[in-house]
A protein has these predicted regions:
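Short Cys/His-rich metal-coordination motifs, predominantly Zn2+-binding knuckles/fingers
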Residues: 5-7
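Extended alpha-helical scaffolding segments
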Residues: 9-170
Length: 170
């Protein structure tokens, strides 16, 4: 059975490369790989060490490569990238706005961020889930440095509380 989905299928012996992660090779890096014998377990080689079907492997590598290619779904720093996505495509730019600057005043995200900066929650319905992952490259390998999931409402409450705590009295 696939360790992620529980489906029965053909297991992926190797995983496709994830590209555009700082620190990884220009040709990409692997999130999952077991090349040296020291990393093999109980005589299992390559993808036998993590039970993931070809379908699941294709889905996660394609999704990460898309998020890293699309500027609205990631931020790149010297030592890594942050990717983000949501159940609601209109809310996906939230993390980029929060970390990387604000949009134009006529855009809905500007209104949301403006309310958060004043310590108020936005007056909008929010999607169920929001996801943020930090990726770092090291030659041919990629590691997940953090993974955060919450409701967007929960994430906004945390950001709002942080901004209120950081507020300086004049």
């Amino acid at each position: 059975r696939d360790a992620i989905t529980g489906e029965i299928g053909v297991f992926a012996p190797v995983h496709q490369k994830i590209k555009r992660v700082p620190g990884a090779r220009p040709t990409g890096g692997s999130l999952i790989s077991f090349k040296p014998v020291a990393f093999q377990s109980y005589g299992k080689k390559n993808g036998e060490n993590i039970l993931m079907t070809e379908h699941t492997q294709f889905a996660y590598t394609t999704a990460l490569n898309y998020l890293l290619m699309d500027p609205t779904h990631h931020l790149t720093f010297k030592n890594g990238s942050i990717v983000f996505w949501s159940d609601d495509p209109e809310m996906e730019p939230f993390a980029k706005e929060m970390i990387g600057g604000f949009s134009k005043p006529e855009e809905p995200m500007y209104q949301i961020m403006n309310r958060l900066l004043r310590g108020r929650m936005p007056r909008t319905s929010l999607p169920d889930r929001y996801y943020i992952a930090g990726l770092r490259g090291n030659a041919g390998r990629i590691s997940v440095s953090f993974f955060y999931q919450d409701t967007l409402n929960g994430l906004m409450k945390r950001v709002s509380n942080h901004l209120l705590r950081m507020k300086m009295d004049s």
